[in-house]
Amino acid sequence: MQESIFSAIYISLYVSIISTLTSFVFSFPLSVFIVIKKFKLKSILITVINALTSIPPVCAGLICYLAVSRSGPLGWMEILYTPYAMMIAQFIIIMPIILSLIIRNLEEEYPLFEEEFRSYGAKYFQILKLLLLNKYKVYFTIGIIGFGRA
């Protein structure tokens, strides 16, 4: 009995941690890109991202199930009912939350540094690095919020 409980706890923590880290790794550069670039549909994109933060876990699970079932586009991977499918579902749930929170934070912070980045001629990856190192505690907190949703 003890071994099965610890196994379930281990898998749950493993899946949640990996999906949270993966979501953050994808969300941070994407959110910096969204905040830095000026394009016509920016406000609509941010509104859609904010709306996706309330996606019910059942819907995310259904989307994941349809994607990884035998007849789905990822059916060839044969990962249905595995931790990998759980990671995909949690990624679908967590990604909009982390993306939305980082965008909201960067919209406040980036204008303070924009002229400085421009004067130094900072490239995109340098901006990513500086923004991440400048407010790492905030981004750690955002990661914890995403983990809590997982």
Whereabouts are the PLM-identified features?
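Short charge-dense sequence patches
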Residues: 1-2, 13-17, 117-126
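Short helix-to-coil transition segments within interhelical loops
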Residues: 109-136
